[in-house]
Structures are given as structure tokens and as C-alpha cells.
Amino acid sequence: MEDEHVADLLIAGGSADPNLAPLVAAAERAGRSVLSIVHGPEGEPAFSWDLESNRLILDGREVGARGAFLRYDVFTPPVEARGLDRNGGWYAAAMGWALSRPGMRLLNRAMTHGANQKPYMLRLARDSGLATAPTLIANVEADLRAFPAPAVAKPVAGGGYVRPLDAALADAGWREGRSPIPAIVQQRLSYPEHRIYLADGRFHLFEIHSDLLDYRPGRPTSLVYRGAELPWPGVAEALAKLTAAVGIDFCACDFKTEAGRAAPLFLELNSGPMFAAYDLAAQGRLADAIVAQLTQE
């Protein structure tokens, strides 16, 4: 067996994930060495972590890393022949090893449970000084039908697209005036939509236009990088307060426009966002910032 190889950055995830390649390219630009744990239908690495010695043997070689970027694979069907979650298993193994390494640089290592709770984050955003749209979280048919139009509905726990409220009401599966799951219902806002990434202690602003209510199922009409400065007074300070409150140091926050209001309204925070298309629009600046955050001395 070869002596331990310690890389500057471990990158782990699924072979079909388009977000990994920009990080590898950014690491190469920065002169950082990369260790990969990439799994997928075409093959798996040989992974053996002995907890007694705390040594990781990867493809027959003892390895280590100073920083790590790890993503759960959402691009490959997760269930293998015996009904086990292959993607979850690889993520748990790699993340478990990374978390056990003292001093390992990770994104959002201090993140609290609340960061991934969308209703809580809407309330906390208000408390932090960010404006949000009028919002109702409910499964009561009468209350939802009384919400002022135009309005939209979105899954309370994420994992789905934004829909017109009328369409959501039509197939909600009502039983005795209640739906099976509460929904987030909000005033319908307009484009432009803004996505703000936090990486390496700085914000990165993108402006999005689309003909769709929710641009994510297709491609936006335009996606433009607007730089590292936020043009709305007080938004950067409020967003910094929000992310600090939940231990976030890397994320994407989405905002949308209300007619007559200068600053956009906060929609949600994503603690594990995709970023490949945004990095392309920013000509590599976003991936460069992520690599810098994970490899700086």
C-alpha cells in the first residue's frame, strides 16, 4: 500500500452531477490538488475506512484531505437492486469521514436544523430585516381559498415547483375541508428573479428572467451575473444576519420582484444549491469562490 496522499480538496458525489466539474476546473486554476470519490451506475470506488485507526483507503491508497465538497447525488436513481439507497449510502460514508477529521474545511459545518425549514426561514428572514411576500401556511380549504389573488402555492418542505394557487387547489385531495399536507401560499410576484449566492464570505448576484412561473423546469430566458455587490440598501446586512443566525457560510437565496417596490422580496434559502449554470454565467467566479473557501490556509 502506498503512503498517505493528502489532497487540498476532496470532491465527492455522483458521476452525473454537473456541479462537480466546475469545482475540479477551479481547483486546477488555483493550483490545488484534488481527491475524488465519484460513484455512479458505471462503477464505484473502493472505499474502506477503519474507525479504529481512522484511516481511509481509497482504491488501494491511504488518503486524506484538508477541505471537502460533498453532494448527495440527485441525478442518478437512488435505489439499487435490494431496495437500498445507494446515493444516500455514499453520501453518509463520505460525509461521516469528513466530519470526523479535525480541522477539515466543510461548507456549512455549523449549520443549524432550522436552515432547511422553509417556513421558519421565512419568519426568520422577516426578523432579520428582509421583506417577504404575504404568506399563509395552511391545509384548511376555506383559508386557502380566501387568500387574495393572484397567488401561488409551493411545497412546505420543498422538493417541488411553484404552481398557481387555483391549480393547486383543484387537485389538493381535500378531505373534510383539509388537504393532506400544509402548503406555502404567497402573493404572486414578478420577474426579474434574483439569486444571491454566499461563498467565501461574499455575495454573488444573478438576475433571472423567464416566461414560466417557476423557471426551474426549463431554461430561463436570461441568466446574467451582476457581480458581488447588492444594489439594494440594507439587503446585504440583513442577509448576513439571516445566514449567521443559522450557521450558514454557503447558500443560495432567491428573491423576486413586487411592482412598485425597489428591493426584491425574499423567497427561500437553499443550503445545498446547484450552481453549474450560474458558475458558467459568472465565468468561473462562483466555483473559484467555493474552492477558495474550502482550501484557504
Walk through the language-model features, giving the residues of each.
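Conserved N-proximal alpha/beta basic substrate-recognition cap immediately N-terminal to
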Residues: 14-26, 35-131
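A short linear hydrophobic-aromatic micro-motif
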Residues: 133-134, 152, 183-185, 250-253
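Glycine-rich phosphate/pyrophosphate-binding beta-alpha loops
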Residues: 270-282
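A long amphipathic alpha-helix within ATP-dependent nucleotide-binding catalytic cores
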Residues: 215-266, 278, 287-297
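Phosphate-binding site of ATP-dependent enzymes
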Residues: 27, 149-238, 242
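Loop-centered beta-sheet repeat module
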Residues: 114-116, 120-164
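Extreme N-terminal starter segment of soluble prokaryotic enzymes
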Residues: 5-10
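Short acidic-glycine loop/turn motifs at beta-strand connectors
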Residues: 31, 50-53, 198-202, 259-262
